[in-house]
Amino acid sequence: MSALVYFSSSSENTHRFMQRLGLPATRIPLNERERIQVDEPYILVVPSYGGGMAGAVPRQVIRFLNDEHNRARIRGVIASGNRNFGDAWGCAGDVIAQKCGVPWLYRFELMGTQRDIDNVRKGVNEFWQQLSRSA
């Protein structure tokens, strides 16, 4: 299996989801001055912020993806959000999928449920298997 990369704000909702998921993952730093580079294909797990499509993707994630090295390795995106955002629920996944030309694989609310954890575990495994067969 390849990597998961995620960002979690100070609310730690996405971080708690990733801990429960129990798969190897790299966290995009909260501090905007810290940078990371990912050297293998990865699925990005990202929260969505309110304010519509324009403000949905966290700045740290934008900075991470603006690095061509990182952008070249993204293979899919999973988004979290809050259903209170209505149509914009989880829309960071849609924005990133469109801009990076990758599939939007799943969306979950806040910290996710056990069903979300199970679905993501299974889906991530199947996604990497399918991708490796088509390579």
UniProtKB/Swiss-Prot annotation:
Coiled coil start-end: none
Record-linked Pfam families: Flavodoxin_NdrI
Gene Ontology MF: a single term: FMN binding
Cleavable signal peptide: none
GO biological process: protein modification process
InterPro entries, per database record: Flavoprotein-like_sf (IPR029039), RNR_Ib_NrdI_bac (IPR020852), RNR_NrdI (IPR004465)
Family listed: Belongs to the NrdI family.
Function in brief: Probably involved in ribonucleotide reductase function.
PANTHER family, per database record: PROTEIN NRDI
Protein name (Swiss-Prot/TrEMBL): Protein NrdI
Protein's organism: Salmonella gallinarum (strain 287/91 / NCTC 13346)
